[in-house]
């Protein structure tokens, strides 16, 4: 099973809490995390893009780096680990993304890929006059299909003459173009999975619940059904947060502390912003992100326990049919990657060290 790290491009990582580690994003922090991940054999590092935060007492995600420029820097200071940047497709034309991808591939040949997001938080785009209107919630995958068609044309052949509703190319050219650039999509609605099965190489989905490592299995089954219609091989990666310590009790105490300190103002903003997109269907990511059960870490699957318990749950994840790997966040990234590499991974049967 492959393992990746979802690096903290925004302040405080993925914990919307006053009692979790508080920190600002920086290149040095993410370099330390990514180089440490590479040292311990992690397969890839991915950064998100976030253009407006949730506010609150912790100013959650009000402070963010930019994904492509950060990953270009990390590409230059690593040698093996794969590097994925995220593009908010409403903000950068596909021809420019293709040229940026070509440039980063020149820095790290064969190691770079792109994560495509349609955009669901209206405030991110309306603040700069780029929000296309409420129809985007229902038409976004049509937009993304055109966007990706142009991007793939340019990445694979260096030329695009695509003519569509949203994009019109006129002998558009990008050279040099990389030999291979993997594409990721994180949509989990039926429409999102259908898009992924048609255009992407990897699907990223949220794990579910606390210490319920296989609860996401239905997403894999839905992706498999979608891929069967397109005849393409699309690999599934699942997002989890790891909160580990020497004992189950110590780890659970940390988790409870973070939950007790939840930043309610920021969580209220998240709920407000997610509501319009959630109307698109109960299987959308935003419906899960804002659910009250564990909004303190955006309701991603959470693994809490001793190093032995985490290793056991990781192996359970690996047994779910269709799972190619996991994408991990940590409450404390520097210590978390260190502990994973030295204390968890060696115990895993699903990794080379196990």
Swiss-Prot record:
Record keywords: Flavoprotein, FMN, Monooxygenase, NADP, Oxidoreductase
Protein name: Pyrimidine monooxygenase RutA
Function: The FMN-N(5)-oxide reacts spontaneously with NADH to produce FMN. Requires the flavin reductase RutF to regenerate FMN in vivo.
PANTHER family with a match to the protein in the record: ALKANESULFONATE MONOOXYGENASE, ALKANESULFONATE MONOOXYGENASE-RELATED
UniProt-listed InterPro entries: Luciferase-like_dom, Luciferase-like_sf, Pyrimidine_monooxygenase_RutA, SsuD_RutA_monooxygenase
Pfam families according to UniProt: Bac_luciferase
Family label: Belongs to the NtaA/SnaA/DszA monooxygenase family. RutA subfamily.
Domain of life, per lineage: Bacteria
Source organism (scientific name): Caulobacter vibrioides (strain ATCC 19089 / CIP 103742 / CB 15) (Caulobacter crescentus)
NCBIfam families associated with the record: RutA
GO MF annotations in UniProt: alkanesulfonate monooxygenase activity; monooxygenase activity; uracil oxygenase activity
Residue positions binding FMN: 49-50, 115, 124, 140-141, 189
Catalytic activity: uracil + FMNH2 + NADH + O2 = (Z)-3-ureidoacrylate + FMN + NAD(+) + H2O + H(+); thymine + FMNH2 + NADH + O2 = (Z)-2-methylureidoacrylate + FMN + NAD(+) + H2O + H(+)
Gene3D superfamilies reported for this sequence: Luciferase-like domain
Keyword Flavoprotein applies: yes
CDD domains: Alkanesulfonate_monoxygenase (cd01094)
EC nos: 1.14.99.46
One GO biological process term: alkanesulfonate catabolic process
Record's keyword annotation contains Hydrolase: no
């Amino acid at each position: 099973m492959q393992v990746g790290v979802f690096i903290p491009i925004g302040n405080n990582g993925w914990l919307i809490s006053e009692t979790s580690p508080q920190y600002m994003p920086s290149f040095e922090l993410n370099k330390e995390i990514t180089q440490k991940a590479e040292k311990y054999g992690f397969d890839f590092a991915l950064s998100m893009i976030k253009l407006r935060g949730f506010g609150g007492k912790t100013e959650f995600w009000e402070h963010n780096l930019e994904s492509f420029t950060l990953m270009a820097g990390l590409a230059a200071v690593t040698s093996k680990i794969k590097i994925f940047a995220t593009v908010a497709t409403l903000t950068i034309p596909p021809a420019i993304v293709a040229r940026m991808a070509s440039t980063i591939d020149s820095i790290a040949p064969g190691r770079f890929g792109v994560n495509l997001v349609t955009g669901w938080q209206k405030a991110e785009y309306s603040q700069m006059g780029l929000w296309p209107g409420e129809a985007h919630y229902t038409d976004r995958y049509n937009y993304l299909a055109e966007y990706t068609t142009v991007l793939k044309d340019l990445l694979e052949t260096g030329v695009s003459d695509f003519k569509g509703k949203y994009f019109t190319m006129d002998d558009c050219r990008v050279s040099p173009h990389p030999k291979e650039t993997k594409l990721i999509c994180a949509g989990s609605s039926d429409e999102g999975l259908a898009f992924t099965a048609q255009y992407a190489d990897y699907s990223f989905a949220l794990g579910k619940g606390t210490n319920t490592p296989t609860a996401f299995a239905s997403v894999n089954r839905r992706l498999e059904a979608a891929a069967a219609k397109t005849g393409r091989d699309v690999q599934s990666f699942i997002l989890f947060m790891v909160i580990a310590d020497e004992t189950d009790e110590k780890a659970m105490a940390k988790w409870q502390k973070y939950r007790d300190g939840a930043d309610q103002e920021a969580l209220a903003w998240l709920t407000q912003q997610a509501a319009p997109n959630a109307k698109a269907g109960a299987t959308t990511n935003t419906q899960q992100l804002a659910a009250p059960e564990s909004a303190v870490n955006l309701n991603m699957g959470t693994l809490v326990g001793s190093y032995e318990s985490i290793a056991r749950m990781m192996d359970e994840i690996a047994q779910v049919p269709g799972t190619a790997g996991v994408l991990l966040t940590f409450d404390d990234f520097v210590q978390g990657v260190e502990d994973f590499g030295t204390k968890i991974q060696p115990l895993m049967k699903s990794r080379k060290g196990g």
